[in-house]
């Protein structure tokens, strides 16, 4: 198959990569041969090896220089049919240069083509858009040289044609900008086309328009200036730019064109008014107008229509220019008036003419600043002195600043809100501090209660004045409600608290129950207040596995309250009388005795941290919830740094025997004691209680766990020192119950049972028997009312214990 059919072009002139699979003929005998096989042309060549080409050869490749000869590698084809000027080595064989000489024939047809297309080039020059004198001179030089022929046939437009179709095409395509520049070109074409068929008509037109003259450059410039001054830059720019280039155009191509120009210049009379536009339109075959002086405005109109501009008569142009001036003037007026921030009419004008005018950023800022300034002034007039200090200061700042950006306004608003919140929080914290102070003063003396009322009412009024400006939150409403409830409770508890010192048992029980409920309310309100305020509350939890009690929390007030109450309690120490304080202790003990305290399972550990001694009374608020979760809120104040070094750890004792000594009327509630016979009491020293995370100034803390009934009551236990009670005890009782080193295991367990019953029911019994006196003494010891600590050394005698107490 490769030896049949047509030749493979790539095999003979290049390299065929298909090899035997190529459907075309590969014949090595025909390589380098450019003779076509005549038998193949007739379709009768059946030779297996034909030395002639089975291909139509339309080019003389021997006259075409080889492309690869000029490459760095050179031509490496053995049978290359192209022309080689130099000899070459191919596979070790030297091939001489081609014998045939390259003819110069290919250049001569190009010259002929150039000569034949000179007229076409000149016609093309007349149609080109940018025909400035410089470009024309460049084109003349190029046309005189050998310019290669264009790749596509040029569009030749005969300027002598009178067809209206061509004119319409010109006007539609928007090529009218070229028409004034064609002023001398018709003569050029007429001079070139002397042999054309349309020459007589052109000659007739030349005779008709021999009366027009070619203007000089100065005349054109002067007329342009006049037109510009008349039309004030509107509409005249297009026409004057069109009339810019007519003078230097004549005679750029040939001598016969110059002869035509000579005939035209001979007929020119300088005194006449040149009719340039009329001659142009007639010679170019454009729309013909009447040959009178009325032809100028229609020509202007046609030029404007061609340019796509709406050029009106000069009267309308002069009417338009004052409009422009008026518009610009009104713009300046508006800008000038709107610069005044107090002028509201100017802003109305700006809104009216806002359809045309686009405001800048500065104008908008000025208007907004003026509006804000006016609003602030009206607010100041209406509100007057009834405003708060914050609002007046904000209004002054807004009145002093005239122009503010959005970011500045937002920053000021945020700053005001932050200041208001700071003031409010400060007042709330002061109110809460005064409230807590009033609670502490209430338990100590009655006269400070009245003073603390007055102090706590002032910040409440201040917060109300602040809340007139700001919206109240739920927390603020809760705080106000808590203050009102506190004031009402203070007024209600003032009268019974005066009679608390009387030793009447039943009356005291009734009064303490009332105070329990009220103190519980105060506790709940204090928790809400503590949520809002910034007063730190240090809390600790001790997990207690009891049937009715789960969690005990201790909250300790801040050291500032301690310092304030320290001074008050130093004064109170001098005024306090021991007898009514003993009555208070008795009443509170009877109240505590009413609760079944010993309802704990065996093995419960009681964490009792030794409390530092103090002469003043302390307030212990015990709150029991419905699920019997007890929250012990110990608000106390003591001289911490003086007595801290004297504190010694108490002993850890176990209890094996439970003794219940109670009054007959409390017997039903004491039945729980028999069900839990063993209770462990562990008294830890203060140094081991690291749960309370307090600074060194606040290290005096109380961990006390009291198990109460599920009744929802709380008690305020005021206590005081009672050194005389310890002297009443006989030595036998104290030795049998309170000095464990001298007693065996059961006696020490009995002593620990007495110590455990610091909050039990037997403390409420009147001091009739020796055992009840000792229970009262142990209650005072556990409550922290010791002036000197108990030192249970084995060397001490039984009689030394009351002396130490």
UniProtKB/Swiss-Prot annotation:
Residues 403-423 form a coiled coil. Residues 140-194, 223-351, 364-433, 449-468, 481-506, 715-805 are annotated as: Disordered. Keywords: Coiled coil, Metal-binding, Repeat, Zinc, Zinc-finger. Residues 391-402, 750-763 have a biased composition (Polar residues). Residues 364-390, 412-433, 455-468 have a biased composition (Basic and acidic residues). The keyword Aminoacyl-tRNA synthetase does not apply. GO terms for molecular function: zinc ion binding. It comes from the Eukaryota. The keyword Acyltransferase does not apply. Signal peptide: none annotated. Residues 486-498, 730-749 have a biased composition (Low complexity). InterPro entries: Znf-CCCH_3 (IPR041686), Znf_CCCH (IPR000571). GO terms for biological process: poly(A)+ mRNA export from nucleus. A zinc finger (C3H1-type) spans 2-29, 31-57. Residues 160-175, 789-805 have a biased composition (Acidic residues). May play a role in mRNA transport. This is Zinc finger CCCH domain-containing protein 11B. The lineage of its organism: Eukaryota, Metazoa, Chordata, Craniata, Vertebrata.
């Amino acid at each position: 198959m490769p030896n049949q059919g047509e030749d493979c072009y790539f095999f003979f002139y290049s390299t065929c990569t298909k090899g035997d699979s190529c459907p075309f003929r590969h014949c090595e005998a025909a390589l380098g041969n450019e003779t076509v096989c005549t038998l193949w042309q007739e379709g009768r060549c059946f030779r297996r090896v034909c030395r002639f080409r089975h291909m139509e050869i339309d080019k003389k490749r021997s006259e075409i220089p080889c492309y690869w000869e000029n490459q760095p590698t050179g031509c490496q084809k053995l049978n290359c049919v192209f022309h080689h000027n130099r000899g070459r080595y191919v596979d070790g064989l030297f091939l001489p240069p081609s014998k045939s000489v390259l003819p110069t024939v290919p250049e001569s047809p190009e010259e002929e083509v150039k000569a034949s297309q000179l007229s076409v080039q000149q016609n093309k020059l007349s149609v080109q858009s940018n025909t400035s004198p410089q470009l024309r001179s460049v084109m003349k030089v190029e046309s005189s040289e050998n310019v290669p022929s264009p790749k596509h046939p040029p569009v030749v437009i005969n300027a002598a044609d009178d067809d209206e179709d061509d004119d319409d095409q010109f006007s539609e395509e928007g090529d009218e900008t070229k028409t004034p520049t064609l002023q001398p070109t018709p003569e050029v074409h007429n001079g070139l086309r002397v042999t054309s068929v349309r020459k007589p008509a052109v000659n007739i037109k030349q005779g008709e328009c021999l009366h027009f003259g070619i203007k000089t450059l100065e005349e054109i410039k002067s007329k342009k200036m006049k037109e510009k001054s008349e039309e004030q830059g509107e509409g005249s720019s297009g026409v004057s730019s069109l009339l810019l280039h007519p003078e230097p155009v004549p005679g750029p191509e040939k001598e016969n064109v110059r002869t035509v120009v000579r005939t035209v210049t001979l007929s020119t009379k300088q005194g006449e008014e040149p009719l340039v536009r009329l001659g142009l339109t007639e010679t170019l075959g454009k729309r013909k107008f009447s040959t009178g002086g009325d032809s100028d405005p229609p020509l202007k109109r046609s030029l404007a229509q061609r340019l796509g501009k709406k050029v009106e008569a000069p009267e309308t142009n002069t009417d338009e220019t004052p409009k422009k001036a008026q518009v610009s003037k009104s713009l300046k007026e508006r800008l000038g008036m709107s610069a005044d921030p107090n002028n509201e009419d100017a802003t109305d004008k700006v809104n009216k003419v806002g359809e045309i005018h686009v405001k800048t950023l500065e104008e908008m800022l000025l208007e907004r600043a003026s509006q804000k300034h006016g609003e602030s002034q009206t607010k100041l007039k209406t509100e007057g002195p009834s405003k708060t200090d914050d609002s007046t200061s904000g209004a002054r700042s807004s009145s002093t600043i005239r122009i503010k950006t959005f970011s500045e306004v937002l920053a000021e608003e945020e700053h005001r809100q932050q200041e208001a919140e700071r003031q409010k929080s400060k007042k709330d914290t002061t109110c809460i501090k005064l409230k807590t102070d009033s609670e502490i003063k209430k338990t100590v003396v009655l006269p400070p209660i009245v003073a603390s009322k007055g102090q706590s009412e002032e910040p409440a009024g201040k917060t109300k004045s602040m809340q007139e400006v700001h919206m109240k939150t739920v927390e603020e409403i809760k705080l106000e409600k808590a203050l009102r409830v506190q004031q009402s409770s203070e007024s209600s508890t003032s009268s019974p608290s005066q009679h608390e010192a009387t030793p009447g048992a039943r009356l005291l029980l009734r009064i303490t129950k009332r105070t329990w409920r009220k103190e519980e309310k105060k506790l709940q309100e204090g928790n809400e207040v503590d949520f809002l305020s910034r007063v730190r509350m240090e809390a600790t939890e001790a997990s207690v596995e009891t049937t009715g009690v789960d969690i005990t929390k201790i909250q300790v007030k801040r050291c500032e309250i301690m310092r304030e109450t320290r001074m008050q309690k130093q004064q109170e120490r001098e005024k306090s009388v021991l007898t009514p304080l003993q009555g208070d202790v008795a009443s509170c003990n009877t109240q505590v005795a009413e609760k079944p305290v010993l309802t704990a399972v065996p093995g419960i550990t009681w964490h009792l941290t030794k409390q530092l001694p103090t002469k003043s009374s302390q307030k212990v608020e015990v709150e029991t919830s419905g699920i019997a979760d007890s929250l012990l809120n110990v608000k106390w104040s003591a001289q911490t740094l003086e007595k801290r070094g004297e504190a010694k750890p108490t002993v850890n004792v176990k209890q094996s025997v439970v003794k219940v000594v109670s009054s007959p009327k409390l017997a039903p509630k004491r039945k729980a004691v028999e069900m839990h016979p063993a209770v462990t009491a562990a008294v830890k020293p203060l140094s081991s209680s690291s749960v309370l995370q307090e600074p060194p100034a606040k290290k005096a803390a109380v961990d006390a766990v009291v198990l109460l009934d599920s009744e929802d009551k709380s008690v305020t236990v005021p206590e005081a020192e009672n050194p005389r009670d310890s002297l009443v005890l006989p030595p036998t009782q104290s030795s049998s119950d309170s000095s464990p080193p001298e007693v065996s295991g059961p006696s020490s367990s009995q002593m620990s049972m007495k110590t455990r019953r610091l909050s039990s029911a037997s403390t409420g019994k009147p001091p009739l028997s020796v055992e009840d006196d000792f229970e009262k003494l142990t209650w005072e010891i556990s409550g922290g009312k010791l002036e000197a600590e108990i030192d249970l050394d084995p060397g001490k005698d039984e009689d030394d214990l009351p002396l130490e107490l």
